[in-house]
Amino acid sequence: MTFLDMLRNATAQNQSMLCVGLDPEPSRFPAAMRGDASKIYDFCAAIVDATADLVNSFKPQIAYFAAHRAEDQLEKLMAHMRAVAPHVPIILDAKRGDIGSTAEQYAKEAFERYGADAVTLSPFMGFDSITPYLQYEGKGAFLLCRTSNPGGDDLQAQRLADLPGQPHLFEHVARLAQGPWNTNGQLGLVVGATRPQEIERVREFAPSLPLLIPGVGAQGGDAVATVKAARIGGGPIIINSSRAVLYASQGDDFAAAARTAAQATRQTLQDAAAA
């Protein structure tokens, strides 16, 4: 089954647009685990177990594991997610971007070592830095397009004077991803929830692509405006929440609190879709 098929099935089965991001920070763990990087797997597995029926995807952020020499725990977590939620796709948040020969190794890491269903990438180095990932049939690749961080304006909002209509860089990325780069229907886009009007603009260029949308929750994105904008064109929607779910409680009830937070976010997104 392809990543896109898995995403659509999980969205329907769990009635959810919610992605839970797995960004483990040991300093924020419950008291019994706090500061202990060897407990990263235990913490994340408990979150997965508590939310697996509420999400359409999980998104482990590789830096939060690598910084603590916890790649082995990430491998174990990937296997656990496969066992307890085989219908839920896993997006490895790596934001890789490098020349083709190096990209081949990053693709091997994402899809062979970790067994991810999709990966996040930077398109800055062009199509030949993306193609090694697309060699993995059925896997997904999300290109950074219009991100939620303030510094995204430095490059993404700049206009390309040499192209017809002088599009913004993020608009050009969306056009390429919808069109000539999407040779096997594997691409999606990362678009931040803090700029709903620009999600609408992205949808003009990429109506059918899946959108991975961080920024709802801790980053302050408006759920109703985000869902309304993302639904234009009918492409799949993945709305990520990380900290608001992971750290809903720093007590022993952290997993139950994470479930409650995920339920509330899923309901908010469902209400937004119905508005």
From Swiss-Prot:
Q: In which pathway does it act?
A: Pyrimidine metabolism; UMP biosynthesis via de novo pathway; UMP from orotate: step 2/2
One GO MF term on file is:
orotidine-5'-phosphate decarboxylase activity
Ranges in coiled-coil conformation: none
Q: Which InterPro entries match?
A: Aldolase_TIM, OMPdecase_AS, OMPdecase_type-2, OMPdeCOase_dom, RibuloseP-bd_barrel
Assigned keywords, A-Z: Decarboxylase, Lyase, Pyrimidine biosynthesis
Q: Which reaction does it catalyse?
A: orotidine 5'-phosphate + H(+) = UMP + CO2
Q: EC number(s)?
A: 4.1.1.23
* Broad class of enzyme this protein falls into: lyase
Taxonomy, superkingdom: Bacteria
Residues forming the catalytic site: 95
Instruction: Name its GO BP terms in alphabetical order.
Output: 'de novo' pyrimidine nucleobase biosynthetic process; 'de novo' UMP biosynthetic process
Matching PANTHER family: OROTIDINE 5'-PHOSPHATE DECARBOXYLASE
Q: Give the family from UniProt.
A: Belongs to the OMP decarboxylase family. Type 2 subfamily.
Q: What is this protein called?
A: Orotidine 5'-phosphate decarboxylase
Species annotation = Delftia acidovorans (strain DSM 14801 / SPH-1)
